[in-house]
Amino acid sequence: MAQTLNRSLTDLGALLHLVDPTLPIGGFNHSNGLETFVQQRVVESKATLEEYVQTQLLQNWIYNDGAYLSLAFDAMNEGNFDRLCELDWQLSATKVARESREGSFKLGVRLLKIFIRYETHTLLTAYQQAIAEKRVQGYFPIVFAMVAQAMGLTKADTLYAFYYNAAVGAITNGVKLIPLSQMDGQDILFDLRGSLVQAVELSLDPDEEWLGAATLANDIRAMQHEVLYTRLYMS
């Protein structure tokens, strides 16, 4: 019993570390197009921010970052390094907005730099070498999956943590940009609990035919962000 409890708490600690908002990777610098939505007054209230995050979660992330994370987790389980590289290349092709694309691999490279110091895994080492040799970029969802699998976490827990982290980031940015009260942000996060579980269920075995399915409005806003007159975020 004690051994099982210790393992469970160790896994929980690893998961919390992986999604720690104070990780020095720069995630707080990126809105991924949300700042444009706010400046255009498309997202301007508690209701529209919640609608935005729900749309991102169930119409964008499950076909993009979440799906790639799921497939990368499987590749780690299989020890398939070539597949991990292939997923990195595919993800690069589907991120059409330059700022979002560059932001993702910058976060991934920094995340790997942190956790490779603690997790001994041949594929993590090989992937870091491939990044150094510019054979892959090191996108955030790929690295997140690799690190989580190396920690011994389950895929479902990893997906939930990833989506939760993304949702918290979007809500935090929206609260700051609109602006809204902190309690409004907490209400939105509470309302998302069921949707987060749904997103995990839809991502456990992703249909590769749907990889890269886009919310075009978000991609356009992410590209427009490059030329905003004033901005707080890098993407």
From Swiss-Prot:
GO cellular component: cytoplasm
Keyword Cytoplasm listed: yes
Subcellular location, record wording: Cytoplasm
Molecular-function GO terms, alphabetical: nickel cation binding
InterPro entries: UreF (IPR002639), UreF_sf (IPR038277)
Primary localization class, coarse: cytoplasm
Entry similarity comment: Belongs to the UreF family.
General function of this protein: Required for maturation of urease via the functional incorporation of the urease nickel metallocenter.
Subunit structure: UreD, UreF and UreG form a complex that acts as a GTP-hydrolysis-dependent molecular chaperone, activating the urease apoprotein by helping to assemble the nickel containing metallocenter of UreC. The UreE protein probably delivers the nickel.
Protein name (Swiss-Prot/TrEMBL): Urease accessory protein UreF
Record organism: Haemophilus influenzae (strain PittEE)
